[in-house]
Swiss-Prot record:
Its EC number is 6.1.1.5. This is Isoleucine--tRNA ligase. It comes from Onion yellows phytoplasma (strain OY-M). It is found in: Cytoplasm. Catalyzes the attachment of isoleucine to tRNA(Ile). As IleRS can inadvertently accommodate and process structurally similar amino acids such as valine, to avoid such errors it has two additional distinct tRNA(Ile)-dependent editing activities. One activity is designated as 'pretransfer' editing and involves the hydrolysis of activated Val-AMP. The other activity is designated 'posttransfer' editing and involves deacylation of mischarged Val-tRNA(Ile).
Amino acid sequence: MTTNYKTTLLMPKTDFPMKGNLGKNEINIQKHWQKLDLYQKKLQQNQDNNPFILHDGPPYANGNIHMGHALNKILKDFIVRFRSMQGFYTPLIPGWDTHGLPIEAAVLKKTSKNAFTRKPLLDKCQEFALENVNNQKHQFQRLGILGDWQNPYLTLDKTFVSDQVRIFGQMVDKGLIFKALKPIHWSPTLESALAEAELEYHNHQSPSVYVAFSMKKLDIFDNVALVIWTTTPWTLPANVAIAVHPEKEYQLIEVLQKRYLVGTKNIPFLQKVFAWNKENIKVVATFEGKTLEHLTYQNHLVSKFGKIILSQHVLDGEGTGLVHIAPGHGLDDFLVGQKYNLDVVCSIDKKGMMTDVSKYQGLFYTKANEAIISDLEKDHSLLKADVILHSYPHDWRTKKPVISLALPQWFVSIKKIKSLLLEETQKVKWIPRWGELKMTNMITNREDWNISRQRTWGVPIPIFYTETHQPILDLKLINHVADLFEQHGMDIWYEWDVKKLLPENYINPQSPNNLFTKELDIMDVWFDSGTSYSVFKKRNQVLQSDVYLEGSDQYRGWFNSSLITSVATQNQAPYKTVITHGFVFDGEGKKMSKSLGNVIDPLTVAEQKGADIIRLWVANTNYNLDVRINPSILKQVEDLYRKIRNTFRFMLGNLDNFKKDTNYIAFEQRTFIHQAMMLDFEEVLKNVLHSYDTYNFEGVLRHLFPFITNKISAFYLDFAKDILYIEKEDHKERKMIQSTIYDLLLSLLQVLTPIIPHTTSEVYGFFPFAVEKDIYLEKMPQLKARPTSHLLLEYHKFLTLRKNVLQYLEKARQSGLINSSLQAHITLSLTQEEMHALDVLQIKDQLHQLFIVSKVTLQLKDTFDVKVAKASGYACQRCWNVVITKPLTPLCTRCQNILK
């Protein structure tokens, strides 16, 4: 009867499960965190240390979270967890953007627009926003995001609104807020103004018309037409001037008995447009642009005369060299019109309907285009009509085209602070680096910021008007309103009459009858979120955050508005570092949509596969660019996760019965091969910690995962089996290996906690001699200052040598010479340099274990070589090394001694 020697082996033993079952287990781990109050406990641990503030940009409180939200919040969680484990005090205040059109539109969608008076609409909007905040809060928590979830900041909170109004007041006091009639981006669909940040540019079909305006007869200008080109025929009834460039050359040409005035450099382009033969073009006269100033022409559409003016914004190339000017429908037109005191005529109203300035009154502007083109043709003023596809601004919410319309609006003066904005932009660290150029260009080209909106759900613009309709720009008055809002909420702006809103006994010389009115427009929601740094003041934290991290679309949005309000009031940027991530697409780089059936829902993935799988996917992407996800990509991430988990399990299993207080052997007392393993790992740790420090999470895995799979699992733990399983429990080298495994595992758990916190928390629960109640309460590994270079150099030479030996063994296995490496006896020919490496590491007697063979014979030669032979003798029935010379002997001498 054969003896079962397996029972004499010290096999790995652990209750840590092989299968993660993350969908269910993560919820239990999160309950463990909640019971510990883990977020607050970590803050208390670091409360006396330097702060590190990541300011959470507020997502919009509308709908469930999507994979873009998951990417954003998980990246932030990586940073906060890492910095807190470094020892920084890292409060994370989650926030939500709770005002604005999408919420108002969603509420109105459920009933007719006229069914609500203002107060019930405000109540319904608030109810809708809070419901979505609560929903998203639980969804973010399911992803393992830590933060002060009990005390988030909401842009609808009384304290937030009052602080926002105070910031507005400071900007008023500095002369940065003004009301003016200006052309703005206007949505006729929403009947509201839009900021630059609310525009998207899409390809759009527009009419393309070339129109001839008859010049008033004067000497040479008899029967001459000024030729203009426009893609907005509906603006022609609002035309009051035609602009030419003062320094450019113009020619009066005759083509087939018709006379036109056009730019000289535009003639080749016009030849193609009108199919003119060059020989049919006769140049009658040549002029410098400035000589044409004040000449007049007739606009037959409205039977009015306009004049030629000079402007620098007239360009060569495409077009005619003359620009149709309608100050009511374009900022450049408006600005040049101011110089000439031109009338601001608007041919359409807020609904996009034509006004009474023309016979087209009542037509929607797109319908008016057709009628205008028809009338121009009848009048013989139309030279050519076509349709072009070009980039055109659309409202980013409705996806409908916007128009330019002159209306009285409230603005922030960018011009006054532009130089300081640019100066502060240069002080910020931008990741990626091109972010600085992008923001610089945006600020350089930015016009005054239109902050008024003609909607209901938002923060009122806290301005009163005198009897003469003059706005009262008074800091004390605005701060008084802010105090009222903080006490009673912003709805009082609509519920209370003006006198109740004003300070008691308030008087103003411009209102002798003590009559006042109030502004009914609300603030742009970007002004709301753009003042969110104010939440730190009431929590006794610095206003300038260490990091803002959002999607790359926020250069025009939150990064921009926050910079403007902070520079305007604090004279500094609100952030030291700005990090951006790309958008999430499917595996083929396509946008996710329900219609395409390619949507990957983070909550579904968390339920089915686990939040740590999503987090590991995030860490494995170059998030600065657009990223991709699909089931195949997630499968690869699961495979990666499984290898990490299995390694953790094997390491835990081999720490069974390990008593750190009595079994642990310090680094200095371990033999060189185990020291070298730790030194090699510490080099990896340096790179891992540097990657974290530079927000390169892909780099964390790039350094860590190959080490786990190739160095720890495939090398160290593999060769260690012959010692861990076979030797006695108190064998010195076995304790060295266990001590090394202990150090490796603890450090791995520490550095992987920001990325897969549920898993590391679970492993830590099985970890012997855990000193904290959760791995998150540990610190990041502290790198030791050791003189490592010589030992590590020889160790790397050995690893290269071992890699070559394994290739020879694999060839022998494939040829059928051996079935497993333990059947091999290798003769190793080494150079002096290679032999020296073995001497330094003191591993010559251990090579059979390191190569997992039964016997190694060494020879000093000029060149490296390996000869593989089948080991002679019999295999030990316990350790399976082929070292027994006598038949029918079950155990080798080593195993016999162990079992004595």
